[in-house]
Amino acid sequence: MIMSLGPYASFIVTSYAAAALVVAILIGWIATDYRSQTRRLRDLDRSGITRRSGRSAMDRP
């Protein structure tokens, strides 16, 4: 199936390619940041620092 995009074909194809590239970069950035945050939380848990959500009401000052 071949589509005729007319005289604006290069603009349309370039726009879709740019949008796809931006989405791919954002997905990569989010995946990298997720791994980084998970690693930081694991390191903090190992060092003994607990999360606020893990504390009970009696632990608060």
Curated annotation (Swiss-Prot):
Keyword list, A-Z: Cell inner membrane, Cell membrane, Cytochrome c-type biogenesis, Membrane, Transmembrane, Transmembrane helix, Transport
Chain coiled-coil ranges: none
Family indicated by similarity: Belongs to the CcmD/CycX/HelD family.
Domain of life the protein comes from: Bacteria
Assigned GO CC terms: plasma membrane
GO biological process: cytochrome complex assembly; heme transport
Cell location: Cell inner membrane
Lineage: Bacteria, Pseudomonadati, Pseudomonadota, Alphaproteobacteria, Hyphomicrobiales
Name recorded for this polypeptide: Heme exporter protein D
Principal subcellular localisation of the protein: membrane
Topology with respect to the bilayer: Single-pass membrane protein
Keyword Glycoprotein: no
Annotated TM spans: 11-31
Protein's UniProt keywords contain Cell wall biogenesis/degradation: no
Source organism per UniProt: Bradyrhizobium diazoefficiens (strain JCM 10833 / BCRC 13528 / IAM 13628 / NBRC 14792 / USDA 110)
InterPro entries: Haem_export_protD_CcmD (IPR007078)
Task of the protein: Required for the export of heme to the periplasm for the biogenesis of c-type cytochromes.
NCBIfam families (alphabetical): cytochro_ccmD (TIGR03141)
Gene transcribed to yield this protein: cycX
